[in-house]
């Protein structure tokens, strides 16, 4: 027993040094994933402890949305939800593992999916930016309405009271200092038929909503995180309407607070827009997905940016977030089954974190 204790003590400086090297190379090593279903919470907790923590994950963007038993607005709960007890299990394992939780609710855009509204517009249809656009029985893209996802109207006088109560409750139960508001792929904004938004500048509308959320969080010393696509000019860059904006919201980049954390996602190519955000004064993480060759190039890029930029710029390139767009359960399944390397999103995750770990050896 004494020998084991001595070995553990002697190993501590080595482990601490390895951690310092890892943090220096890649301060944020994140995973963005949907929150698990309540019945699978214990399995997800074990996954964090046995798979994520040993690989060096230190940031977990948890897409909760309406998968929580909100007390402030129980009418907005999904049919089955995580309870406070479930959440505290996730909080406990993340604290133990040194993992920062950033809970997420999709705000402004992504208020519907395919044929159904999400809970906010289903319960409060008056918040809909485009009430004349009806949800289809069968969803196809493209379509005559340009419907990808619905948005709430950012100028509706009653929407923010509800949204802010959800934010407060979720950040408190997760004991979180940061909150992710989504804010990606907002196509419906400033519509001509909207009695409040018609004729308004879309960049100003978008910036106004972003700053409003940011300012609310700042009252309790919390920080806003968001996806960066609406802040990129899709026409000038050739990046198009998904990974960038084609409806003029890109000008909002000069209208929003600089302490907002940008999650800069690109999945088809290793586009270098992290440099753009850093030059504008934002802290930024590059977000990758399922093309593991692209993911590796993006990981190498962010390391290179940190090495080769000015001291001021170096500190703005914060790291990598791997995004997983299936259910939490499907990612856990990938680790439980053989031939995990053939599952592309998980392969990208493993490659990125194994690469950073190899570089971190002192």
Regions found by a protein language model. Give the residues of each.
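Bacterial Sec-dependent N-terminal signal peptides
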Residues: 1-21
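Intrinsically disordered, low-complexity segments enriched in glycine/proline and serine/threonine
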Residues: 5, 15, 107-109, 283
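Residues that line or immediately flank small-molecule/substrate-binding pockets and catalytic motifs
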Residues: 8-11, 35, 64, 183, ...
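N-terminal hydrophobic targeting/anchoring segments and the immediately downstream early-domain regions
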Residues: 19-50, 54-55, 59, 126, ...
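Aromatic-lined carbohydrate-binding surfaces of glycoside hydrolases
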Residues: 32-245, 252-254
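Catalytic-core regions of glycoside hydrolase
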Residues: 173, 195-355
């Amino acid at each position: 027993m004494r020998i084991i204790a001595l070995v553990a003590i002697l190993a501590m400086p080595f482990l601490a040094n390895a951690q310092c090297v890892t943090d220096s190379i890649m301060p944020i090593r994140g995973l963005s994933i949907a929150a698990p279903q309540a019945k699978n919470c214990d399995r997800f907790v074990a996954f964090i402890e046995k798979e994520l923590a040993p690989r060096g994950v230190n940031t977990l963007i948890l897409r909760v949305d309406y998968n929580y038993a909100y007390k402030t607005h129980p009418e907005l709960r999904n049919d089955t939800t995580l309870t406070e007890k479930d959440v505290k299990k996730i909080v406990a394992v993340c604290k133990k593992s040194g993992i920062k939780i950033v809970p997420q609710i999709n705000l402004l855009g992504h208020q519907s999916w395919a044929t159904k509204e999400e809970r906010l517009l289903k319960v409060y249809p008056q918040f809909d930016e485009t009430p004349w656009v009806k949800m289809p029985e069968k969803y196809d893209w493209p379509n005559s309405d340009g419907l990808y996802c619905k948005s709430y109207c950012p100028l509706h006088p009653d929407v923010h009271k509800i949204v802010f109560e959800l934010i407060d409750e979720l950040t408190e139960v997760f004991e979180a200092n940061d909150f992710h508001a989504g804010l990606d792929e907002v196509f419906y904004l400033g519509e001509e038929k909207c009695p409040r938004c018609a004729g308004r500048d879309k960049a100003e509308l978008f910036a106004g909503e972003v700053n409003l959320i940011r300012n609310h969080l700042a009252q309790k010393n919390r920080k806003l995180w968001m996806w960066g696509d609406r802040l990129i000019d899709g026409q000038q860059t050739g990046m198009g309407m998904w990974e960038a904006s084609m409806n003029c919201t890109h000008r909002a980049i000069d209208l929003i607070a600089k302490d907002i954390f940008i999650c800069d996602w690109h999945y088809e190519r290793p586009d270098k827009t992290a440099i753009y955000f850093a030059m504008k004064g934002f802290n930024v993480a590059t977000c990758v997905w399922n093309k593991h060759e692209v993911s590796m190039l993006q990981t190498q890029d962010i390391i290179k940016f940190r090495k080769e930029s000015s001291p001021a710029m170096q500190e703005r390139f914060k790291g990598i977030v791997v995004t997983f767009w299936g259910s939490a359960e499907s990612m856990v399944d990938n680790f439980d089954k053989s031939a995990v390397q053939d599952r592309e999103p998980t392969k990208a995750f493993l490659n990125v974190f194994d690469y950073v770990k190899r570089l971190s050896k002192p």
